[in-house]
Amino acid sequence: MPRYKLVIEYDGAPFRGWQRQADDPTVQAAIETAVTRFSGETARLTCAGRTDAGVHAIHQVAHLDLAKDWRTDTVRDALNARLRPQPVAILSAEVVPQEFDARHSAIRRHYRYRILNRRSPAALTRAHVWQVPWPLDAELMHRAAQRLLGHHDFSAFRAAECQAKSPMRTLEQLDVTRVRMGLFEEIVIATSARSFLHHQVRAMAGTLMLAGCKRLSADDVAEILATGAKHRCGPLAPACGLTFVGVDYP
């Protein structure tokens, strides 16, 4: 029984997240339904990062097992044909060893958070950015972000319903940059870690936003982390600005 690794891109706006639910549309359900329509088999997908409702992906990775040894380009093209018109694309398919696990074999995950920083409304990207109309200082945000790097208890930045056994995580990257293209002003937060807590990236983004408008200092952010003072964090940044951008394997 061959195991297939899929690289997947999707717009999270119409979905209630990755994970299959009984009555709501999800990315997992869409792909598994396409697999059944294509192969006649019932397969269960395992992904690298289970994204929440409204969160996007440009390089999600998942694996599944099928009884038949299909050509990988056939798997890719057949799934894409059966996924239309849903905003989900299979970018590639390859056969991998049975030992490969899209979730447990991952050594690093990468996310990007986008903030549209202007007063005029977002005409084209409203489902992919968090619009903050007041001025933000990206350099102040970056300085505050550096205080979150390393191995810490991230209790202040986890959802109340987070099911992780431990709040300890090692944040390897958290960079904040401003992108300017004419009148286009976007702040991009790029972050990497082996794993993240539920809502961790969005919670950090909301807190860094407060640093950007000078309501929190870098020292304040460090103190929030050290004390677990969740009430001092910024708002939970909306899901629409978050994108799963990649995953590393050994």
From Swiss-Prot:
Active site: 52
One Pfam family recorded for the sequence: PseudoU_synth_1
Gene Ontology biological-process entries: tRNA pseudouridine synthesis
Catalytic activity: uridine(38/39/40) in tRNA = pseudouridine(38/39/40) in tRNA
Enzyme Commission no: 5.4.99.12
A GO molecular function held by the record: RNA binding
Annotated substrate binding sites: 111
Keywords from the named record: Isomerase, tRNA processing
Residue pairs linked by disulfide bridges in the UniProt entry: none
InterPro entries the record matches: PsdUridine_synth_cat_dom_sf, PsdUridine_synth_TruA, PsdUridine_synth_TruA_a/b_dom, PsdUridine_synth_TruA_C, TruA/RsuA/RluB/E/F_N
Enzyme class of the recorded protein, top EC level: isomerase
Role, per record: Formation of pseudouridine at positions 38, 39 and 40 in the anticodon stem and loop of transfer RNAs.
PANTHER family from the UniProt entry: PSEUDOURIDYLATE SYNTHASE, TRNA PSEUDOURIDINE SYNTHASE-LIKE 1
NCBIfam families xref list: hisT_truA
Subunit structure: Homodimer.
Protein family: Belongs to the tRNA pseudouridine synthase TruA family.
Entry protein name: tRNA pseudouridine synthase A
